[in-house]
UniProtKB/Swiss-Prot annotation:
Interacts with hair keratins. This is Keratin-associated protein 19-8. InterPro entries: KRTAP_type8/19/20/21/22 (IPR021743), KRTAP_type_19 (IPR051528). Keywords: Keratin, Repeat. It comes from Homo sapiens (Human). In the hair cortex, hair keratin intermediate filaments are embedded in an interfilamentous matrix, consisting of hair keratin-associated proteins (KRTAP), which are essential for the formation of a rigid and resistant hair shaft through their extensive disulfide bond cross-linking with abundant cysteine residues of hair keratins. The matrix proteins include the high-sulfur and high-glycine-tyrosine keratins. Belongs to the KRTAP type 19 family. GO terms for cellular component: cytosol; intermediate filament.
Length: 63
């Protein structure tokens, strides 16, 4: 299991995954970060990454 640091300017882009930040984009972007779903496809449906919170910093746990 690898962890990618998704904190970026307060929004938290979920980079990491396939092709750098292709699949990782939907995981940890805006309100989708707070909901904790999505991986790549606009943050809908898929749950292959989940953002975790540590002191306000988002970490995307890539499974």
């Amino acid at each position: 299991m690898s962890y990618y640091r998704s904190y970026y300017g307060g929004l938290g882009y979920g980079y990491g995954g396939f092709g750098g930040w292709g699949y990782g984009y939907g995981c940890g972007y805006g309100s989708f970060r707070r909901l904790g779903y999505g991986c790549g496809y606009g943050g809908y449906g898929f749950s292959c990454c989940r953002p975790l919170y540590y002191g306000g910093y988002g970490f995307s746990a890539f499974y």
